[in-house]
Design a protein with these regions (language model features):
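ABC ATP-binding cassette signature C-motif
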Residues: 1-35, 82, 91-306
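Post-kinase regulatory C-tail/linker adjacent to protein kinase catalytic domains
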Residues: 86-88
């Protein structure tokens, strides 16, 4: 049997650990679904009260909504569960083929081929990690795939309906202005996710009054986290991520990894975080200077092949 301490309560689960994991997963999904449904209801009530509370013609209805709001027994998620509570907007539909690369070659100063005659096919739903030593061309390849670098030889054929979202540390430079963090992210979030913005910001280490900081006063690392969250709220179906776990703590990395595993699109990423790579990858592309090898399995499979 298994005993779990969760949210301050100790609960007993009969059976072995495998049985416990299955039962607990169902319980957590049920709790999260109920929480999300209630948060949506609360948001609708609060929105009506905010918009019509001061209009004489709607005052009675607003008061009735306030009574409904006051009667709600709120579902509380334990802090440990909130840390893993994040969902993407639905990914736009695209075909099975996401990208095909034919003979991609990239050199600097016309002397050295960092990437040489690279061929690659990426299909919908795959999560490709690009690995290799520093200087092997990992970030260069991601810039090419994202369209940021067009100075290369070869051909990139995107699939039907593919919409690319690209993240690198340079994205932080776009986060500026006198808007608060909360207002900025709410302006980027789809309507159905606005009630969950505070939870999302908390998952990315913006908690309490931090959400009222203006963008201009944020550090580079904080701006990078905001840029990443903004991208994750965008309607894309191919995410190209260069070191997305930089500036995240352990729990936030878990948030990101679990969200990406549930993402309805395709992911190409570079990371130095071994746990993140092992937990997320379904396919590996190894780059060495001027060479490449593709492995049709996760990172553990790649390690076994070495």
């Amino acid at each position: 049997e298994v005993y779990e301490l969760f949210g301050g309560d100790l609960k007993r689960y009969p059976g072995n650990f495998t049985h416990y994991e299955k039962v607990r997963e169902v319980e957590l999904k049920t709790l999260i679904a109920a929480y999300e449904q209630q948060q949506q209801e609360i948001h609708h009530l609060e929105d009506f009260i905010r918009r019509f509370g001061y209009k004489a013609t709607k005052a009675a209805q607003a008061q009735e909504r306030q009574k409904q709001l006051d009667k709600i027994v709120r579902i509380e998620l334990p802090e440990s569960l909130k840390k893993i509570h994040f969902k993407f907007p639905p990914a736009p539909h695209c075909g099975k083929l996401v990208l095909r690369l034919n003979g991609i070659t990239k050199s600097y100063d016309g002397i050295k081929n960092v990437i040489n005659n690279l061929d690659l096919t990426l299909e919908n739903g795959e999560r490709l990690v690009v690995v290799g030593r520093n200087g092997a061309g990992k970030s260069t390849l991601l810039r090419i795939l994202s369209g940021e670098d067009k100075n290369f030889v070869g051909e990139i054929i995107p699939g039907s309906g593919v919409q690319i979202g690209y993240f690198s540390q340079d994205n932080a430079e776009t986060i500026k202005g006198s808007t608060s963090i909360l207002d900025y992210i709410e302006s980027k979030a789809p309507t159905e996710l606005i009630p969950k913005v505070r939870d999302m910001l908390g998952a990315f280490l913006f908690r309490g009054d931090d959400v009222f900081k203006t963008l201009d006063v944020l550090s580079g690392g904080e701006k990078s986290r905001i840029a990443l969250l903004q991208l994750l709220l965008s309607p894309v179906n191919l995410l190209v991520l260069d070191e997305p776990t930089n500036h995240l703590d352990m729990h936030s990395k878990d948030v990101l990894m679990n969200a990406l595993k549930d993402f309805g699109g395709t992911v190409i990423f570079v990371s130095h975080d071994r746990g993140f790579i092992e937990g997320l990858s379904t396919k590996v592309l190894e780059l060495t200077p001027g060479k490449f090898r593709e492995f049709p399995g996760d990172y553990k499979y790649y390690q076994e092949c070495l």
